[in-house]
């Protein structure tokens, strides 16, 4: 029987540091406008009426989150994250044991559009596995020689997608797949890869390519541009 349009909980793993940003401040706490990247990311989730609760997994030594307005938000729960992303997601899943479906969203992905989120959430009407936001690969892709800055070969880009977030799955299925994959030593780079490891095939829901993750210093200005443009479009 297909799932109905039930309320959804979200998990945001925010315990990482992001050393590629070359800053002393964890990237999720860098500011764009008058909000941190984390606040932009979380507010995009809470803007959808189906998302009733957001669990944020932070580092046990994190002293920055308590200073944000988010810390007092009634729909937000904070848990201690782990050393790896999967550990933080599992900690978040434990806090929403009553949820049937969960979103997992990157703390440093602040440019999520509401129409993309709505399309992703709609798959719960006829899916038992879930899916992810993704964008088709547009550039020519090259495989590098191991340990060298040299091209090994060109990778056929047909059917290649950039995996984005949020990713959206039945809570119990995601919990079981993450647990099994970690116990068996599998390499888990996102939540969908845990389901793939266990033999499932999540759906690809095409999303906007400007739903970027802030990873490098130059991404900050780009994210600010996208967010400013979106605000102006909403006011128009």
From Swiss-Prot:
Keyword ATP-binding: no
Transmembrane segments: none
Site (Positions MEP for the nucleophilic attack): 157, 213
Catalytic activity: 2-C-methyl-D-erythritol 4-phosphate + CTP + H(+) = 4-CDP-2-C-methyl-D-erythritol + diphosphate
Highest taxon listed in the record's lineage: Bacteria
Record flagged with keyword Transferase: yes
Assembly description: Homodimer.
Family according to the record: Belongs to the IspD/TarI cytidylyltransferase family. IspD subfamily.
Protein name: 2-C-methyl-D-erythritol 4-phosphate cytidylyltransferase
Origin organism lineage: Bacteria, Pseudomonadati, Pseudomonadota, Gammaproteobacteria, Enterobacterales
């Amino acid at each position: 029987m297909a799932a109905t349009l039930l309320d959804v909980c979200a998990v945001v793993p925010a315990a990482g540091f992001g050393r590629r940003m070359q800053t002393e401040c964890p990237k999720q706490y860098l500011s764009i406008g008058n909000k941190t990247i984390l606040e932009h990311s979380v507010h995009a989730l809470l803007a959808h009426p189906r998302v009733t609760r957001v669990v944020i997994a932070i580092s046990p030594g994190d002293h920055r989150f308590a200073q944000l307005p988010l810390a007092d938000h009634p729909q937000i729960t904070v848990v201690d994250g782990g050393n790896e992303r999967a550990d933080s997601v599992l900690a978040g899943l434990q806090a929403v044991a009553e949820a049937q479906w969960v979103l997992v969203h990157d703390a440093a992905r602040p440019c999520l559009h509401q129409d993309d989120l709505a399309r992703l959430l709609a798959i719960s009407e006829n899916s038992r596995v879930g899916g992810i936001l993704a964008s088709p690969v547009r550039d020519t892709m090259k495989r590098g020689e191991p340990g060298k800055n040299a091209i090994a070969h060109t990778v056929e880009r047909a059917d290649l997608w950039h995996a984005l977030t949020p990713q959206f799955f039945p809570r119990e299925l995601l919990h079981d797949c993450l647990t099994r994959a970690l116990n068996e030593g599998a390499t888990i780079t996102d939540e969908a890869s845990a389901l793939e490891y266990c033999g499932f095939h999540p759906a690809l829901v095409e999303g906007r390519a400007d739903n970027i993750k802030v990873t490098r210093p130059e991404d900050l200005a780009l994210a600010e541009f996208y967010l400013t443009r979106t605000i102006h479009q909403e006011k128009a």
